[in-house]
Amino acid sequence: MGMRMMFTVFLLVVLATTVVSFMSGRASHGRNAAASDLIALTIKGCCSVPPCIANHPELCV
């Protein structure tokens, strides 16, 4: 392989890695949002229970 061919292959590998990394990062945003919603619902549940409010008042501000 010549230098140009090796450089071209290198650029293609970098591009493919970047695209895969970008797409997998995007896919995880939905999972993170779902986890955040679950945490928010749990905290709201805690705020409706007096003993939980007493133990964790910072959550119910």
Curated annotation (Swiss-Prot):
Protein name stated in the entry: Alpha-conotoxine-like Am1.4
Post-translational modification: Is not hydroxylated. Contains 2 disulfide bonds.
Primary residence: secreted
InterPro entries: Conotoxin_a-typ
UniProt keywords, alphabetically: Acetylcholine receptor inhibiting toxin, Disulfide bond, Neurotoxin, Postsynaptic neurotoxin, Secreted, Signal, Toxin
Tissue expression profile of the protein: Expressed by the venom duct.
Residues making up the propeptide: 22-44
Family designation: Belongs to the conotoxin A superfamily.
Function: Alpha-conotoxins act on postsynaptic membranes, they bind to the nicotinic acetylcholine receptors (nAChR) and thus inhibit them.
